[in-house]
Amino acid sequence: MSSTFTDAPDLPLPSSYGDPERTGLGANDLFEGISEHLFFTLGRRVDNASPHDFYLALSYAVRDRLTSRQLASQDALRAHERPRAVAYLSAEFLIGPQLGNNLLMLGIQAEAATALQRFGIQDIEQILALEEEPGLGNGGLG
């Protein structure tokens, strides 16, 4: 019988798991995270990156921070003997753009604005406005 990931002992964590540029909430950490994603994820240098590139790099940097916290929450949940979860899904609720909400939930709106200012982007709203509404249509049913 093959072993599952939960059976495997001492699985290694990615080397960037605790790096501030991946998980830190400060303006410098976000600046480094955005820089890393511009170059390594998007293949862009700062001097030729478009506003959309900065939107994507900021989104990836925020996702890094959310992912590390999500995994910590899952670990805490698994530590309980009988974990329980409640989920609610409404087909009538449109979630809208998420980057601004995620910045708010992490409490890093000002830090993100400061990080973007270091790239010469004075108004974070210009970057947030680039996010498209999630495609949650009703299939023409109403």
Label each region the model flagged.
Residues 2-142:
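A conserved ligand/cofactor-binding region detector
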